[in-house]
Regions:
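Condensing-enzyme catalytic core mediating Claisen C-C bond formation in acyl metabolism
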Residues: 1-26, 163-165, 196-262
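Conserved catalytic cysteine-centered active-site region
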Residues: 2-4, 17-19, 54-112, 116-143, ...
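Conserved small/polar residues in nucleotide/adenosyl-binding loops
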Residues: 280-282
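Buried hydrophobic positions in well-ordered alpha/beta secondary-structure cores of metabolic enzymes
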Residues: 9, 36, 47-50, 97, ...
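Generic secondary-structure signature for well-ordered alpha-helical cores
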Residues: 14, 38-42, 71-75, 102-107, ...
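Active-site-proximal alpha-helical scaffold in enzymes
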Residues: 85-115, 141-175, 216-222
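Short, well-ordered amphipathic alpha-helical segments that serve as non-catalytic structural scaffolds
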Residues: 26-41, 65, 93, 144-148, ...
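N-terminal beta1-alpha1-beta2 module of alpha/beta enzyme domains
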Residues: 10-55
Length: 282
């Protein structure tokens, strides 16, 4: 059975800052939600279901925040799903929300993902031993630095590839008034001059800890017909594998290769390098 068409008809984003002390978690989410609904020309009463995305609870120090957020999210008396896939939660939340429309379960779905890490201690949260998992004792940067070095060695990428990406992203962020960082004049040279944190990752290559939220309104084909400029979802794919399996290729995981192949097939793409103009990772 093929997926039913689904489209994004409303988007909303908050200002991202180190500390959003002007709003609570609920207020932060509603800020993004209200903007998405306004963009879609809808009200909460018209929404069939809500999907909320949130990374580990320890990042804010609130367990299962979707429970106390239900009313603020407009989910009282409606289906509410919480998505949590750690660092990929942003993309996973959008996939789950769109699947509810593509499967014909709902016609109008509101999805919101947020972080408010200023209310907790991210370093402490990342230091808690996870049961039944291999201890790393290195933090996120120390964990991924060897992967970056391996990628550079295996792919033949320049050793300063991270600085190239960082300079590009910082420049693009200047076009988004809601972005956390607005660092004008960031260049490859300025990134390379910043402090080394985990070889080969430098300070200016890393992201800040932010408070912020984003929201989407995803609807069925018949509802999208009333929208002036719907953004159609041409493909959604999710693949998984054991993170710490001894045979797993950490640099080029099988799950990533399988997901990419399935996505190109869904979207009718035969040459990604020629046909894809913009790419974003979560």
């Amino acid at each position: 059975m093929s997926k039913r068409p689904a489209a994004v008809v409303g988007i909303g984003q908050t200002h991202h800052r180190a500390k959003r002390e002007d709003v609570s978690m609920a207020g932060l989410c509603r800020e993004a939600i209200d903007r998405a609904l306004e963009d879609a020309g809808m009200t909460l009463d018209e929404i069939d279901a809500i999907v909320v995305g949130k990374a580990p609870d320890l990042f804010e120090g609130v367990m299962m925040p979707e429970l106390f957020l239900a009313e603020a999210l407009g989910a009282a008396g409606k289906p509410l799903l919480r998505v949590h896939t750690a660092g990929s939660v942003g993309g996973s939340t959008a996939i789950v929300a769109s699947s509810l429309v593509q499967a014909g379960v709902h016609r109008k779905v509101l999805t919101v993902a947020y972080e408010k890490q200023s209310e907790s201690n991210a370093m402490w949260a990342l230091s808690v031993p996870v049961p039944f998992n291999m201890p790393v004792h290195a933090g996120a940067g120390g964990y991924f630095a060897p992967h970056v070095r391996s990628y550079i060695r295996r792919s033949g990428a320049p050793t300063h590839i991270g600085a190239i990406v960082a300079a590009k992203d910082r420049t693009n962020a200047l076009k988004n008034p809601y972005a956390h960082l607005h660092n004008e004049g960031t260049t490859v040279e300025s990134v390379l001059a910043s402090q080394m944190l985990w070889d080969p990752i430098r300070y200016d290559e890393t992201c800040p800890s932010s408070d912020g939220a984003c929201a989407l309104v995803i609807v069925s084909e018949d509802v999208a017909a009333a929208s002036p400029n719907p953004a159609w979802i041409h493909g959604t794919v999710m693949r998984s594998e054991a993170t710490t399996a001894a045979e797993r290729d950490q640099v080029n995981p099988q799950a990533s290769r399988d997901a990419a192949a399935a996505l190109w097939q869904q979207a009718g793409i035969t040459s990604p390098i020629d046909e894809i103009r913009s790419e974003e990772h979560t």
